Amino acid sequence: MSSTYRLQLSKQFRFDDAVARAGYFASFGVAHLYCSPVLQAAPGSNHGYDVVDPTRVAEELGGEVALRRLVAALHEHEHELALLVDIVPNHMATAGRANPWWWDMLQNGPSSRYANYFDIDWESPISAVKGKVLLGVLGDRYGKELERGALTLQREGSEAVVRYHDQMFPLSPESLDGLELDAVNRDTDALDAILERQHYRLSYWRSAQEQLNYRRFFTIDSLIGLRVEEPQVFDDSHRVILGLIADGSVGGLRIDHVDGLRDPVSYLRRLRSAVPDTYLVVEKILATNEELPDSFPVHGTTGYDFIAQVDGLFVDAGNEGSLTALYHAFTGQSQPFSEVVRTCKQEMMASELAVDVERLTNLLLDICDRHRRHRDRTRRELQEAIRELAAGLHVYRTYVRPGSPASEQDQRQISIAAEGAAGRRPDIDADLLAFVADLLLMRHEGVAEAEFTARFQQLTPAVMAKGVEDTAFYRYNRLVSLNEVGGDPGVFGHSVEEFHSYCSRIAAKWPATMLTLSTHDTKRSGDVRARTNLLSEIPAEWEFAVRRWAERNERHRVQGYPDRNLEYLMYQTMVGAWPVDEVRLVAFLQKAAREAKVHTSWINPVPAFDDALTRFAGSVMADAEFKSDLESFIGRHQLVALGRVASLAQTTLLLTCPGVPDLYQGSEVWNLSLVDPDNRRPVDYERLAGLLPEIRSAGPSDVLARSDEGAPKLWLITRLLHERRVDPDLFGSASYTPLAAVGAKAKHAVGFVRDRLLVVVPRLVAGLGGDWADTTIDLPAGSWRSLITGGEEQGGPGVPVAGLMHQFPVAVLARRARPL
């Protein structure tokens, strides 16, 4: 595995579309085509993570026949490409009849052969739901929908079903005896009686938020948890994928949301046993100072940890105080990010995740009742303890398992959470917090105790994802390039030493982990972040511009909306993604506002605010004087050109640091995408396929002259991927030695040596100003060939960095032969 290229498959870009582009993918040097999920998803799915039938390849993508055409097309090139695919073991989409397992379960209830495939609590403490599954699908209360005739019985082919608008639900066999559909539809009481006999209970969606009795993917009711910890469920849900690996069609897997599983370690061991030689990476988001568990039998993560390290390297930490003061003064927001996080987590657990907390509370009540020192605990105090511990956990989850001692990392995280909870909440009994912490480390044996730990470990990833990624990241806007999946906006930049420490650790422990700068889930593309990071280097100029723009745009504000925090986000977004049109900007701001959940939200939209925001953004975009000022600011500070230099530097690190580089579709040239769905727009492969042969043999000056086309980035990627393909050992060395620079601009250089490979790139490029002055590095002994320019350098002390980069903004050299 030397490199991957991520493709988002959909009905707009199917297997055969990828076949048509196979020559392009092969020609610029990628080794693996890395596809979004390929199994049958819900009708109309545009991403594939809502699988409804894992036993067949997605028909909307072309089915198995088209998939095999793609495999054949990838294999027929001189340099064969392999296929890496995304799998979703954590959940499935309900999607009615489209999901045969779900349909059978709804029809037959607990007696269905698929009843235990889904993570359903058939013994719900709510009597009306016991033995049933609650479905929050109604737009109003059940009685009102029933009485207005929205629920009817109909015949669909040979089946009698319940219809609610465009949704259908099966009738249980035992309720069909003597059933006359027309007669029942005319009699509300009779219809009510029939519905009561089903193995599901139809409910108003708002009420269901407090009564659902199944595990979801985060807070999405239509994505139900799958119990892959059961051998039969694992076998049935993985049979097709494992078959594609066995016959050579697929050469690697990305495991989506591994933290949602009951026991990720056991799952990964079972998967590894089935595919002992297959490349495996997990979508695991690591917190600051967290490491991937050694117990995971995988090659690494999908690369969000690399994003955090690289982004931090290009932020000027010395200006944290200035930008923090500006943010506080301009927006009135003064909470540190850690407090914003805790607040958002608590809000999510009190609202959209309340039903999951309630289930844990019920378990804890039962446990406490059997431990005499805690049997007098009230539901309220137990719930408070659970919420406080979950809110204080700094990682997505722990991995404590029955029969195995908790790792030092897990013990440390639980200890930190418990100590923090005790300090923040002296009103919660310290003995109770200590008891729950011991439960979470499995220091108390028992079935209920193990269940509590497992459920808590499945809850906290949802709390983190919804509370932090999908809420706090949209509330705390100090420098939004840091608001990235896997990042910590509270950490303002990383030192060069921290970056080297990370790379050294990866080289030693996870040399084949995936590296990336952009994904289908990133909030902003790597290029948008690279440009936005430059603001950290010009805080005074940025403040002057923001205050000037705010004063001018006050006339566009609608009834005081939006607030300054959202306005500040807008200015950063416009600078980072410019040129951005009104449609894209408004869509981004609307999503940001609803995710922040301050003035509006997805669940409780406020039309007046949404309209005011749309009108404000539209007026700002139509203001010619403002746009001229914005473009003048961007041009005066050379943010486009400098952002491109930073992008080339980051791309070089992506392609040369320890690990396997992944390129997100369209990112082989400049890509100024925002959060989904903006980052899933179609890629113009016709243009890229035409550009590639034009620049393949061009020199540095020629491609730099075509910078607006993205030529420098595509040229750099093509050259380095070619080198990775023809000389994999050059990039596969486990050695990693930091290379120090000396001189006036030393802090602007990042360099390292990996045996025969030497890399030097610029950082903090606004302050560098394109002038390396007297900055030098010591080039190790030997004859070095530039992989960028083809030039030769001889090893020795005091080699000027300016000389290494006089033709192109980065330097990548390979040693021809070791000195005698």
What are the language-model segments listed below?
Residues M1-P43, V51, T55, E60, ...:
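Carbohydrate-interacting/catalytic domains
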Residues G23, L81, P125-A128:
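Activation on extended, non-transmembrane soluble regions of large proteins
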Residues P43-H47, T94-A95:
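Short glycine-biased active-site loop of nucleotidyltransferases that positions the nucleotide triphosphate
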Residues L70-I120:
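Hydrophobic or amphipathic alpha-helical targeting/insertion segments
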Residues H91, L261-R262:
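Catalytic P-loop NTPase motifs of RecA-like helicase/translocase cores
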Residues A93, P110-L179, E196:
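Long, basic N-terminal domains or extensions that often function
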Residues R254-L261, A705:
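Conserved short loop/turn motifs at secondary-structure junctions
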